[in-house]
Amino acid sequence: MKKQDIIFGIHAVEALLKHSPERIIELWLLQGREDERLTPLIRQAKAFGTSIQVTSRKVLDEKAESTQHQGIVARVKAAKILAEHDLDELLAKTDLPFLLILDGVTDPHNLGACLRNADAAGVQGIIVPKDNSVGLTAVVSKVACGAAETVPLFQVTNLARTMRHLQEKGVWIVGTAGEADCELYQADLKGPLAIAMGAEGKGLRRLSRECCDTLVSIPMSGSVSSLNVSVATGICLFEAVRQRRS
């Protein structure tokens, strides 16, 4: 198990300072960079007694393993990994669960975008399989723009078993499939809900599909056969939001 991680990008570090400042071990800043957005972050980091180093772009690129760090990189204590047994605590806190299941999403940009969508829609937790899925990497946190610190991510060893457990707890699981007869806008998404999305191209795996209470499709009018998983996720989540508010 990793004890430390790297986080980079203004929004990612800002969210960490707001929600879990105790996790930040050290902060590296780009020498000579003048950006008003960095000033309050530096002030907060100093208030928490965080070690701050000013360094070159080459060093930041190496530490972030990316050039998209916006002049700020943090070495942090690894986030707590939530598992299947932690779901019961989450479910006990709400009468109307709203969850997202991502089956086989291995691209960090897609997971980051899904986290951002989930945060905006008010999703209470995202469930991913421990294998065949990307974890909370630095790129995921950067793309998520802070949502990696606000939306709990549950990594489970057996996704089908977890889905059945959710059903036993009264959660209705709606999966997506391009060939499904029921369209998204015809489905009832008002109650305790988990929306299950598959990887782009492959879709939900067979066992995951079999564990869904119903399958829905997103109506498509053009010539393309599928959408990016983060786009499809946003469409499904906000249709649920619309219904739950009406």
Curated annotation (Swiss-Prot):
InterPro entries: 23S_rRNA_MeTrfase_RlmB, Alpha/beta_knot_MTases, Ribosomal_eL30-like_sf, rRNA_MeTrfase_TrmH, SpoU_MeTrfase, SpoU_subst-bd, tRNA_m1G_MTases_N. GO terms for molecular function: RNA binding; rRNA (guanosine-2'-O-)-methyltransferase activity. One of its GO terms (cellular component) is cytosol. It catalyses: guanosine(2251) in 23S rRNA + S-adenosyl-L-methionine = 2'-O-methylguanosine(2251) in 23S rRNA + S-adenosyl-L-homocysteine + H(+). S-adenosyl-L-methionine binds at residues 198, 218, 227. Gene3D superfamilies: 3.30.1330.30, 3.40.1280.10. It holds the Pfam family SpoU_methylase. It is found in: Cytoplasm. Keywords: Cytoplasm, Methyltransferase, rRNA processing, S-adenosyl-L-methionine, Transferase. Its EC number is 2.1.1.185. It comes from the Bacteria. It is an enzyme of class 2 (transferase). Belongs to the class IV-like SAM-binding methyltransferase superfamily. RNA methyltransferase TrmH family. RlmB subfamily. Specifically methylates the ribose of guanosine 2251 in 23S rRNA. HAMAP family: 23SrRNA_methyltr_B (MF_01887). This is 23S rRNA (guanosine-2'-O-)-methyltransferase RlmB.
